Amino acid sequence: MKDVVFIDTSIIVEYLLNGPKADFAEIVLSASSTNVTSTIVYRESLGALAMAFGREKFGIKGKHSLRKFIRKNGWAKFEPVVEALDGLIREGDIVVLQDFQGTSELKSIMKKYRLMPSDAQIALTCRNYSIEKIATFDSDFKRVDFLKTMGV
């Protein structure tokens, strides 16, 4: 059976923006493992990529400016961002899992591992699906004893 690796937001964004660690991200994404991610990672990635694209193309300075721009113009101008993310998921055969929804478990993970809610949600989803490996550049996941981190 193939290894299952959870792909975190940092790997996706680094790869699509061709950042300094994009080579490692490419190795992870092209490995023979079964790569999975979750809806929260999709959402985070879309937001980070839209921000980077908006800064470069439209001079957007921060989250508030991005929200204002989208409120006025919609998502049409960000279609290249959506297409890039969807293309990576499709071509990379990345399975998008539904996040585990349990507030008491979420709070427990947040407290035990000192994580922000989104990171705790990712860890909880990994635990719920029995995923032991996470590809990430976020060192906070090193504190999670049931996950083996790749990349940090």
Predicted regions and their residues:
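Acidic, PIN/NYN-like endoribonuclease modules and their adjacent C-terminal/linker elements
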Residues: 2-4, 123-152
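Alpha-helix capping/helix-boundary segments
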Residues: 11-12, 41, 102, 121-122, ...
